[in-house]
Each structure stands twice: as structure tokens, then as C-alpha cells.
A protein has these predicted regions:
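Beta-sandwich interaction modules
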Residues: 1-4, 11-16, 22-24, 38-135
Length: 136
């Protein structure tokens, strides 16, 4: 049983996969019901090797920017290009050492957990689940 799950994920995805479900994390309870976290670029899924430029047009997000972990240093922040010492341009904002993304999913604390699965749903997308933390 848990009230919330936290996930550390790393993904390789591309701009052509923007605003569609790239993958799903599913948690199933013993009674058969499920909780689903849809992974959508750029709302909560950001490529491992890049940062995104949110300009309100091509890249507009519905959700607040997720927390990210710089894998080279272990620093945690809601990074943006300015913090990373990058300038905004039409070129990708590449990240030295890469960054993983932290996400959370509220759960029903009275139900017993049965399984967790990660499924990619878009072409040319790789998503890795690096860690899971359950909160009672």
C-alpha cells in the first residue's frame, strides 16, 4: 500500500513526438484497478540529453516544469536554459552528462499494489525507469 509513487526516468524522444503520449507508467492494484501516468513531451517527458525551449508556441506545456537530476553532478532543479548557461536558439539545448526527470503519481492508500509497468507507445522512443520510491 502507498499514497504516492515517485519515478526517476530517462528518455530519448524527438520533437516530432511532441504533445502525444510517448509512454505510460501503470500501477495495478490487486482488485484490478489501475493508475496511469501518461508521459507526454514536453509536459512531463524531456529528452535525457537535451532541455526544451518553452516559448508558448511550438513548445507550450500544460503542466509545471518537472524536477530534473543532472546525472553528471547529482544537482536537482527545475532547470531552464539560463541556469544551464545556454542561450536560446533554434539549435537543441544539449546537456553535458544528461538529465533524468522526476515525476510522481498519487495512489489510493487503502488499496494493495500488485504491479508496475512501463510501456512506450510512440515510435522511436526509449524510456528507462531508473528508480521508484513509494510513500506510505
Amino acid at each position: 500500500k502507498a499514497s504516492k509513487a515517485y519515478f526517476l526516468i530517462a528518455a530519448s524522444t524527438y520533437y516530432m513526438q511532441s504533445h502525444i503520449v510517448n509512454g505510460e507508467i501503470k500501477i495495478e492494484y490487486t482488485d484490478g484497478q489501475k493508475e496511469v501516468l501518461k508521459l507526454i513531451l514536453p509536459d512531463n517527458l524531456i529528452p535525457l540529453d537535451q532541455d526544451i525551449f518553452v516559448d508558448g508556441y511550438a513548445f507550450n506545456t500544460k503542466d509545471p516544469r518537472p524536477w530534473r537530476v543532472r546525472l553528471k553532478t547529482g544537482d536537482v532543479s527545475k532547470y531552464h536554459a539560463g541556469e544551464l548557461g545556454k542561450t536560446i536558439s533554434n539549435n537543441p539545448i544539449s546537456i553535458d552528462g544528461g538529465m533524468a526527470t522526476m515525476l510522481d503519481l498519487p495512489l489510493n492508500p487503502v488499496k494493495e499494489l500488485k504491479s508496475l509497468s512501463l510501456e512506450t507507445t510512440a515510435n522511436e522512443v526509449v524510456i528507462g525507469l531508473m528508480g521508484v520510491t513509494l510513500v506510505k
